Each structure stands twice: as structure tokens, then as C-alpha cells.
From Swiss-Prot:
The complex is composed of two ATP-binding proteins (BtuD), two transmembrane proteins (BtuC) and a solute-binding protein (BtuF). Part of the ABC transporter complex BtuCDF involved in vitamin B12 import. Responsible for energy coupling to the transport system. Its EC number is 7.6.2.8. Belongs to the ABC transporter superfamily. Vitamin B12 importer (TC 3.A.1.13.1) family. Residues 1-233 form the ABC transporter domain. It holds the Pfam family ABC_tran. It is an enzyme of class 7 (translocase). The lineage of its organism: Bacteria, Pseudomonadati, Pseudomonadota, Gammaproteobacteria, Enterobacterales. Its main location: membrane. It comes from Salmonella paratyphi A (strain AKU_12601). CDD domains: ABC_Iron-Siderophores_B12_Hemin. ATP binds at residues 33-40. The gene is btuD. This is Vitamin B12 import ATP-binding protein BtuD.
Length: 249
């Protein structure tokens, strides 16, 4: 996999770093750690929305050198929380995020994959929390979807599984896997260690803004590293051929 983003000594006040790492094209990277670990701060920095110490290079150029409009064509970012902007149909909100607004078939396909096919005519300010979360997810997927955006490269997601039930989480995993196979790099924060163990290629484990471990998920999710991050003992079990972590305390 080719390197897409390089972080070197990235830091922000007392909330983050300094930390260094790389993101490769076509990989799923999970940011994990307890609340206050710096995951949201790091994602916002990687999205180019904040500045601070250290440097980030994206696509071979300094992140701060990218024009805002051009950057939005290459990367999409889902904030942890966002209220509906104002009353508009779901289909209209999604269209605003499409590089090619004539691709109605693609809009319908992504909406169907996330269980939104029957909600396209609803107003965004009349949706439940889970419905609005899926609309937001569909929007950022459409923004960088390679079928309509040949320069889409990176998808940054801050706790995308919030408000989603098990079936909806599974549907999102399928969408992300499809994007990954198409070469899109996906960086997302997660609180579900077993989900990360099952679906991520790599993981960065953080605590209080510091990077405890990074690498392949199996290398990061060791009892020693997890104890450092969470202050708990963990056991790793094998359940029907799949590894599973449980707290041992």
C-alpha cells in the first residue's frame, strides 16, 4: 500500500502529541483509546480543520498548502456531532455533497445500502438520531466515492457507529469495505475494541494525547498495551475462529 498521509511530531497544546505515523491508501485505520485520549482532536487535525505543532503531508504536499475546495474533493470528514442545518429533504442534503449531482443512481444506491431508501423525501430536521447519523454518513461517502469522484482518497470518521443499531453498523462496515477495496483510506475513531479487532487493518492506541502503540491490530491489542490505555486487565479469547477481547477484572 502506498503512503497517503504522513504525520510528524503532530501536537496541539496539552490535548495531543507529539505523535508521528502514516496512513496508507486502501487501509482501514482505527483510532482507539478512552475518552479524552485525543481521537477527535487528531481527526480534526488530519482533516485540515485545525493547526498546531508538527507537520502533516497529504498526497505529497503539506496539508496547509491545500486550498479548501480542492481538499474537499480529496478527503471527506464526519464530525462526531452535527445538527441538521435547516429544513430540507434528505435527497437534497445528499445532493449537496455529490461532486456530480446528476448521479442520482449512485445517490439511491448509497442510500439503500445504509437503509435510507424510504427516507429520501423526509426533512432532515424530522429524523431520529440514528437516521440523521446515517444521512451524514451517506453524505461523506458520496463526497469521495470513486465512482463519481476519481480524486477521492481519504475518509475521516469521528465515532461513525454512534446511534447505529447492530444491523446498521453491519451495513456501514460493508460500505467502508467497498471503499477500502477501491483504494480509499479510512481513518475512524472507535470505542468497540472487538469491532476494531475484526474490521481494522491497523490501529493507533492513544491515552491522554499520547500514542501508546500503533501497527497491525493484533500487535496493538496486547494485554500490556491495553492495560496501559484503560487501566484494566484484558483476556483474548477465540470464539468460533474469531479473536475476542474481554475485561478480566
Amino acid at each position: 500500500m502506498s503512503q497517503l498521509m504522513q504525520l510528524k511530531d503532530v501536537a496541539e497544546s496539552t490535548r495531543l502529541g507529539p505523535l508521528s505515523g502514516e496512513v496508507s491508501a486502501g487501509e482501514i485505520l482505527h483510532l482507539v483509546g478512552p475518552n479524552g485520549a485525543g481521537k477527535s482532536t487528531l481527526l480534526a487535525r488530519m482533516a485540515g480543520l485545525t493547526s498546531g505543532e508538527g507537520s502533516i503531508r497529504f498526497g505529497g504536499a503539506p496539508l496547509e498548502a491545500w486550498a479548501t475546495a480542492t481538499l474537499a474533493q480529496h478527503r471527506a470528514y464526519l464530525a462526531q456531532q452535527q445538527n441538521p442545518p435547516f429544513a430540507m429533504p434528505v435527497w437534497h442534503y445528499l445532493t449537496l455533497h455529490q461532486p456530480d449531482k446528476t448521479r442520482t443512481g449512485q445517490l439511491n444506491e448509497v442510500a439503500d445500502m445504509l437503509g435510507l431508501g424510504d427516507k429520501l423525501g423526509r426533512s432532515v430536521n424530522q429524523l431520529s438520531g440514528g437516521e440523521w447519523q446515517r444521512v451524514r454518513l451517506a453524505a461523506v461517502v458520496l463526497q469521495i466515492h470513486p465512482d463519481a469522484n476519481p480524486v477521492g482518497q481519504l475518509l475521516l470518521l469521528d465515532e461513525p457507529m454512534n446511534s447505529l443499531d447492530v444491523a446498521q453498523q453491519n451495513a456501514l462496515d460493508r460500505v467502508l469495505h467497498h471503499l477500502c477495496q477501491a483504494g480509499i483510506a479510512i481513518v475512524m475513531s472507535s470505542h468497540d475494541l472487538n469491532h476494531t479487532l475484526r474490521h481494522a487493518h491497523k490501529a493507533w492506541l492513544l491515552k491522554r494525547g499520547k500514542l501508546i502503540a500503533c501497527g497491525r491490530r493484533e500487535e496493538v491489542f496486547t494485554p500490556s498495551y491495553l492495560a496501559q490505555a484503560y487501566g484494566l486487565r484484558f483476556r483474548r479469547l477465540d470464539v468460533e475462529g474469531h479473536p475476542m477481547l474481554i475485561s478480566a477484572t
